[in-house]
Amino acid sequence: MGGRKYFGTDGIRGRVGQGVISADFVLRLGNALGRVLVAQRGQDGRRPIVIIGKDTRISGYMFEAALEAGLVAAGADVQLLGPMPTPAVAFLTRTLGVDAGIVISASHNPHYDNGIKFFSAQGEKLDDATELALEAALDVPFTTAESEKLGKASRAREAVGRYIEFCKASVPRAFDLRGVRLVLDCAHGATYQIAPLLFRELGAEVIGIGAEPNGVNINAGVGSTHIDNLAAKVRETRADLGIAFDGDGDRVLMADDQGNPVDGDDLLYILARAWKDEGRLRGPVVGTLMSNYGVEKAFADLQIPFLRSNVGDRYVHQVLTEGGGVLGGEASGHLLCLDRATTGDGIVSALQVLVALRNNGQTLRQALKGLVRVPQKTVNVRLGNVSAKATVQAGSVQSALADAQHAVAGRGRAFLRPSGTEPVVRVTVEADDATLMQETLDRLSAAVREAAA
């Protein structure tokens, strides 16, 4: 991403009203994208079409209007989707024959943050050439096309139905959820309409929570970042299981019938084992540096190839693509089922897990009996003004890391992650014995603190 002035690896995100997360910048951003798309279309006579989806945070109205005005002024048509999960926008961009898609969301962040991300006509991240052209266009003054070349705006009326049918098509035609009582936590976010409707159409008895957005309650004590809320509701209602999404619907976590949390590592194990038995699994399964060592051991026992990427679903996607794999994810609930969706999709991933359970006649608890997780803990060591990278590379720290890795060899892992944005080193140790894990973590953390002193 070298040379980028405005964009990170996943669009822009931040506090509303500060920096680029402001109405005036987003107005210019819409105009810049419109001009780039008009230029790419050349002289074919058709105005480019851009779809815009958002989550439920109150600032979405402001940014939706700003993007719409900027795009229309540049000569692009706009179709407004309203509240829509991020993966749904990716799917609709790919299948509606439009030129680009935009999501207004800050995912699992609080309501006072927001962000903008883009999809190409293929429903994927913008290519480098388009992104660089967009950056350059932002440095050119706002442009308004001649009146006869201005764009139009409309609402996409059939978007919800299209996406629901896509989700249903990701499971076998005969699959249904009749007789299943489940709790759905929609984080007061983008899935609040679609998810309950879909699961009810499949026959489930749905108990909904986190499905009453008011603009400022997205992710507030609900959703996949507050799984205890879901777990308590499952126990209270004696449900068969619970499903929690995050604010923009690209993450999913679950709770079993006893209210025990089931995270992305657990779900990855369930899917990998089921898909191997079905002959659906191709290539390696991909987790991240933070995937529990118990998952790695379980996959080794099942003779399932397992690779680790850096933390972040985009890195999981990259390693999967390079290795020809179809299944990956991280503990936070970003799951990639690339034979069903091109991006992480919480609803589609949840459906794949439910199909696996139904095919094997198992509950969530039963499906996890072969997975023995090991104690894992991460400590953030703050360094003051010292470079995190330099601290990790210090000889004393490297020696302490080697000692830690030797101490847990064959029983766990020890590793360091310097933050790229703040003076922090993240120290992680896991081992099959909690005392060994804690003692090793204490020694390694102390070495990092001493090196930074």
Swiss-Prot record:
Keywords: Isomerase, Magnesium, Metal-binding, Phosphoprotein. Its cofactor is Mg(2+). It catalyses: alpha-D-glucosamine 1-phosphate = D-glucosamine 6-phosphate. Signal peptide: none annotated. Pfam families: PGM_PMM_I, PGM_PMM_II, PGM_PMM_III, PGM_PMM_IV. Activated by phosphorylation. The modification Phosphoserine is found at residue 107. One of its GO terms (cellular component) is cytosol. It is an enzyme of class 5 (isomerase). GO terms for molecular function: magnesium ion binding; phosphoglucosamine mutase activity; phosphomannomutase activity. The active site is at residue 107. Mg(2+) binds at residues 107, 246, 248, 250. InterPro entries: A-D-PHexomutase_a/b/a-I, A-D-PHexomutase_a/b/a-I/II/III, A-D-PHexomutase_a/b/a-II, A-D-PHexomutase_a/b/a-III, A-D-PHexomutase_C, A-D-PHexomutase_C_sf, A-D-PHexomutase_CS, Alpha-D-phosphohexomutase_SF. Its EC number is 5.4.2.10. Binds 1 Mg(2+) ion per subunit. GO terms for biological process: carbohydrate metabolic process; peptidoglycan biosynthetic process; UDP-N-acetylglucosamine biosynthetic process. Catalyzes the conversion of glucosamine-6-phosphate to glucosamine-1-phosphate. Belongs to the phosphohexose mutase family. This is Phosphoglucosamine mutase. It comes from Stenotrophomonas maltophilia (strain R551-3).
